[in-house]
């Protein structure tokens, strides 16, 4: 997002979801929330796609870079962000799911694709 005020789900993800009756335990073990802002000072700044390509994202969260043999991705965002992220994944050997219910290494939000 551009500004901290646009981190619409931050409180829910960080405060409410970990206490959720059914999802809380899973969230605590699996979910890594990495908010980044492009136009204000914040603990993580810049585009997420840049952080992926530079390796900064993985350095910050302490995980290995994305690997199509073990990772899957679900992408949503603006049309330009979707296109850029799909291109990154394609270059790294990920295969897009061709359609609803069809297997692939990643899926993206098709409602807003140009």
Question: What residues fall within each predicted segment?
Answer:
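Reductase modules of NAD(P)H-dependent flavoproteins
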Residues: 5-114
């Amino acid at each position: 997002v551009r500004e901290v005020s646009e981190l619409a789900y931050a409180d829910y993800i960080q405060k409410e979801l970990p206490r959720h009756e059914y999802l809380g335990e899973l969230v605590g073990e699996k979910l890594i929330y990495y908010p980044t802002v492009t136009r204000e000072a914040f603990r993580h700044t810049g585009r997420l796609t840049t952080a992926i390509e530079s390796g900064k994202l993985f350095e910050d969260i302490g995980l290995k870079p994305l690997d199509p043999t073990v990772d899957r991705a679900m992408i949503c965002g603006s049309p330009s962000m979707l296109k850029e992220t799909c291109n990154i994944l394609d270059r790294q050997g990920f295969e897009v799911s061709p359609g609803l219910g069809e297997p692939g290494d990643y899926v993206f939000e098709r409602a807003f694709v140009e």
